[in-house]
Amino acid sequence: MPVQGSQRRLLGSLNSTPTATPHLGLAANQTGARCREVSIPDGLFLSLGLVSLVENVLVVTAIAKNRNLHSPMYCFICCLALSDLLVSGSNMLETAVTLLLEAGALVARAAVVQQLDNVIDVITCSSMLSSLCFLGAIAVDRYISIFYALRYHSIVTLPRAQRAIAAIWVASVLCSTLFIAYYDHAAVLLCLVVFFLAMLVLMAVLYVHMLARACQHAQGIARLHKRQRLAHQGFGLKGAATLTILLGIFFLCWGPFFLHLTLIVLCPQHPTCSCIFKNFNLFLALIICNAIIDPLIYAFRSQELRRTLKEVLLCSW
């Protein structure tokens, strides 16, 4: 796949269009000091990937070990951790191979390197897509548990969850394979952007509706106990803050990458867009940061999972 400068080969095709390449130098001259590339050292990439790898391995291990966590909700959380694990692991592998090749410690034919690059691209793309899907699945699961509490266990059964998980993985692999094969088509990039926006809207609508229901419930309790009105106000502020953090982190970590894809379609030759293209590695680093944050939001808040994790860590010593 074509790449530019020091940028990683992994997903490098997203940041190189034949028509835009001659304009990169022009962008630097026209925008001057404003056109800056945020350099991401390889050591930082490896460190972020390692932290994410350890976190998500612990989540998967804890859920696999404790049978009490073999519910649909934790199955989705486990698959999210596995997706984030693959995102981090593939980036670490790509960075390590690149460093070894540049240092001359690893010798391989160009065809072999190209095949390895394509495999890593497919793994990374499929894990990104599956990660977004499982974030949406977790939101849907929580929504059903709140609005259809009495019927939850008949609606969200383990077999249905397993079928949904299998469908997500298969669809992610197939879509990522097509994406790698036709990465230079604008329609492919637009499909990815639309998919991201759909997941963002889905999560925002569901979580806002859940927050409204929780505030309504707290308000009803406050009416019965007038002294608890201040507590109700505090609950509303806390819920709004939690929702803002959850959606804010999702948008901050994933948004720049999909903005990058959008600009490739809309303005591949514009100097300002070319400046944004130079920060492709930063956008990948933000996605890895999201893989670090996901366990803190969705997994480690569970008391049962933390207890199991503590047992796993104690047994390993």
From Swiss-Prot:
Residues with a covalently attached lipid (S-palmitoyl cysteine): 315
Cytoplasmic topological intervals: 64-72, 141-163, 212-240, 301-317
Bilayer topology term: Multi-pass membrane protein
GO cellular component: cytoplasm; plasma membrane
Places the protein is found: Cell membrane
ATP-binding found in the keyword field: no
Gene Ontology annotations of biological process type: adenylate cyclase-activating G protein-coupled receptor signaling pathway; regulation of metabolic process
Highest taxon of source: Eukaryota
Glycosylation sites: 29
A GO MF label: melanocyte-stimulating hormone receptor activity
Tissue: Expressed in the adrenal gland.
TM helices/strands, residue ranges: 38-63, 73-93, 119-140, 164-183, 192-211, 241-266, 280-300
Keywords: Cell membrane, G-protein coupled receptor, Glycoprotein, Lipoprotein, Membrane, Palmitate, Receptor, Transducer, Transmembrane, Transmembrane helix
UniProt topological domain (Extracellular) ranges: 1-37, 94-118, 184-191, 267-279
General function of this protein: Receptor for MSH (alpha, beta and gamma) and ACTH. The activity of this receptor is mediated by G proteins which activate adenylate cyclase. Mediates melanogenesis, the production of eumelanin (black/brown) and phaeomelanin (red/yellow), via regulation of cAMP signaling in melanocytes.
Similarity comment: family membership: Belongs to the G-protein coupled receptor 1 family.
Subunit structure: Interacts with MGRN1, but does not undergo MGRN1-mediated ubiquitination; this interaction competes with GNAS-binding and thus inhibits agonist-induced cAMP production. Interacts with OPN3; the interaction results in a decrease in MC1R-mediated cAMP signaling and ultimately a decrease in melanin production in melanocytes.
Name this polypeptide is given: Melanocyte-stimulating hormone receptor
Species this chain originates from: Macaca mulatta
Designated gene of the protein: MC1R
